[in-house]
From Swiss-Prot:
It comes from Colwellia psychrerythraea (strain 34H / ATCC BAA-681). Signal peptide: none annotated. PANTHER family: 50S RIBOSOMAL PROTEIN L21 (PTHR21349), LARGE RIBOSOMAL SUBUNIT PROTEIN BL21M (PTHR21349:SF0). GO terms for molecular function: rRNA binding; structural constituent of ribosome. HAMAP family: Ribosomal_bL21. This is Large ribosomal subunit protein bL21. InterPro entries: bL21-like, bL21-like_sf, Ribosomal_bL21, Ribosomal_bL21_CS. SUPFAM superfamilies: L21p-like.
């Protein structure tokens, strides 16, 4: 059984017991979160596609960690102008473990 749900402007295909990284959610570690934006639920040959969401569909997850991704470097460079700009960024993310798929 798997489901496709929406969180942080992205779609995620998950199965029960899977760990997935999402955009940062303001929750404590160990908290339970429910996602109602379920786009599709599949159980074998039985596929339920929402329009746009599955009625009664729910993905339940537990927050495992709140962390930051590795640093990426952004470089802007203009040739022959002695102009160079460099910046770095670390994006926050929330790692959740899927504990249940209902629907």
């Amino acid at each position: 059984m798997y489901a496709v749900f929406q969180s942080g402007g992205k779609q995620h295909r998950v199965t029960e017991g899977q760990t997935v990284r999402l955009e940062k959610l303001e929750l404590e570690v160990g908290a339970t979160v429910e996602f109602d934006n379920v786009l599709m639920i599949a159980n074998g040959d039985n596929i339920n596609v929402g329009a746009p969401y599955v009625a009664g569909g729910k993905v339940v997850a537990e927050v495992v960690t709140q962390a930051r991704a590795p640093k990426i470097t952004i470089v802007k460079f203009k040739r022959r102008k002695h102009s160079r700009k460099q910046a770095g960024h670390r994006q926050w993310f929330t790692e959740v473990k899927i504990t249940g798929i209902n629907g």
